[in-house]
């Protein structure tokens, strides 16, 4: 999993871009997490607790995307994917899940999160 962090010099916004099959992680970092150091630390603390065996799993529901982490992996998915099965869209109308959901190993996610934290701290 490759990623790149940038900051728009005109608007000051922070942007994360992740490799193919992980694009939604970039959206989550950029839009749901953003440059909020307290929120970044909250997620890091939860990852640390899970890796230490103090917690089984953790979830952070955002406005558009949700993060779920457990002992094995991190999953980010669009909240719209959580709709009730009886209301599923027809095949022709189905969502492109590859851009709406991504998984990565928990250690890889932690490393990306630490890199994001460092990037944001330097940019503020």
Curated annotation (Swiss-Prot):
Question: Which InterPro entries would you find in this protein's record?
Answer: UPF0231 (IPR008249)
* Species this chain originates from: Shewanella putrefaciens (strain CN-32 / ATCC BAA-453)
Tree of life domain: Bacteria
Q: What is this protein called?
A: UPF0231 protein Sputcn32_0682
Which family, according to UniProt?
Belongs to the UPF0231 family.
